[in-house]
Amino acid sequence: MKDPISIQRIQQLHPQVRQRFTDFITECESTFGITLRIMLPVFRTIADQDALYAQGRTTPGNIVTNAAGGTSYHNFGLAVDLCDLADGGVNWNYDNATLVPIAQKYGLEWGGNWVHIKDKPHFEFRNGHPENPTDLLAAYNAGAIDNDGYLLSI
């Protein structure tokens, strides 16, 4: 992984998936000669997710997510949003579809393949969980988390 900011941000992921995402990003950068940036926030609290969901609905701003609190893999530290760094800035137009074969190799799901909404910067590790991670939310609500707020088991 080339980007020093992404190296810091990867530490926000669930400890059990940090190496998986590091290897995925490193292989993508090596294969395609690009530099990827993990965009913020990586790990969102449920309250943070609810605030993002309210944006453009009940609070000012544009709608930026269709996931309410507890329904995003970001809430469990199991997702990243990636952009290409090019010409000294973030390139939101990079075709992340080129990264999908490598993502699949690491067991990652790409948001650009979703039916109801396309989230092309988004990659998540489901580990057999459904699109809406209700089982992860139930474990979280039951208190099955460590001192840092990560689920004990994913």
Q: What are these model-derived regions, one by one?
A:
Residues 67-154:
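Catalytic cores and adjacent binding grooves of peptidoglycan-active enzymes
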Residues 1-41:
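Active-site acidic/histidine clusters and adjacent loop/turn architecture
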Residues 56-68:
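Cytochrome P450 catalytic domain signature, combining two hallmark sequence patches
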Residues 33-34, 57, 107-112:
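Short aromatic/hydrophobic-glycine micro-motifs
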Residues 38-52:
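Acidic helix-start/capping segments at beta-turn-to-alpha-helix junctions
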